[in-house]
Design a protein with these regions (language model features):
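Acceptor-substrate binding/catalytic loop of class I
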Residues: 163-179, 202-204
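A short glycine-rich, Lys/Arg-flanked "PGG" loop and its adjoining helix->strand segment in the class I
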Residues: 138-150
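Conserved beta-strand signature within the Rossmann-like core of class I S-adenosyl-L-methionine
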Residues: 151-158
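A short acidic, Gly/Pro-enriched loop at the edge of an enzyme's catalytic core
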Residues: 112-123
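Class I SAM-dependent methyltransferase SAM/SAH-binding core
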Residues: 71-113
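Conserved S-adenosyl-L-methionine
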Residues: 189-200
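Conserved class I S-adenosyl-L-methionine
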Residues: 19-59, 61-70
């Protein structure tokens, strides 16, 4: 079980630089202020193709961490499919909404606070860790690898591109295949099983592209 009892929203953790803390808090503040709107716009989006593309690599009943669960859409899908599922998010309001929607206790935590060891067969980080600065990602990928069991599976996705910075109240690190390849070489913990580009599935946003990947722990 993920322990979030130490989280203090008003205090910068020792491991976070001042600039990174500001970036993260700005994004979390956005989600706290727009939690209902965000949940309503994402909860009913048809995402079965992606979910099943991840689940095919897992055994029935495997243990999954929904890492940055947002509205709880994917957590509920995994639970309904019979998978043991934990969920975590950094936004207090989204944690409240997702807990009510999924019926489980969603944990409040920063991505950087993941400290589980070989606890999960799969980690689902869908459109979540993209809010970290690029320089924060290597450490978080290493922590995700540590949290996975032997040859565990990670799905994650990023907006497609090379930009990094604040957009409309949130911080984004965009990714291309080349940028991700470099990051994964530095991390040296995962093999790439699949990497592909898709269009946004939300109405009116098909022009937005996403880089998706399924990785296996070495």
């Amino acid at each position: 079980m993920i322990d979030s009892s130490h989280v203090n929203r008003g205090q910068r953790p020792d491991y976070l630089g001042k600039e990174a803390f500001v970036f993260m808090n700005d994004s979390l503040q956005y989600y706290n202020q727009h939690a209902k709107e965000f949940s309503d716009s994402t909860r009913d989006v048809e995402f079965k193709e992606m979910q099943e593309r991840f689940l095919v690599y897992l055994k029935p009943g495997a243990r999954i961490l929904d890492f940055g669960c947002g509205s709880g859409r994917d957590t509920k899908y995994f639970l309904d499919r019979g998978f043991e599922t934990d969920a975590a998010d950094g936004s207090e309001e989204l944690v409240r909404i997702a807990s009510g929607y999924t019926g489980i206790e969603v944990r409040l935590m920063y991505f950087q606070d993941l400290d589980e060891k070989e606890a999960y067969d799969g980690i689902w980080a869908c459109s979540s860790i993209l809010h970290l600065a690029y320089r924060e990602l290597e450490d978080v990928f290493i922590k995700m690898a540590r949290a996975l069991t032997s040859h565990g599976i990670l799905y994650t996705s990023f907006k497609y591109g090379t930009a990094e910075g604040e957009r409309n109240g949130r911080y984004f690190t965009d990714m291309t295949e080349e940028k991700m390849d470099k990051l994964l070489k530095d991390v040296n913990s995962f093999d790439i099983l699949e990497m592909w580009v898709t269009s946004d599935v939300r109405p009116g946003r098909a022009e937005e592209k996403w880089l998706n990947m399924i990785l296996r722990k070495k």
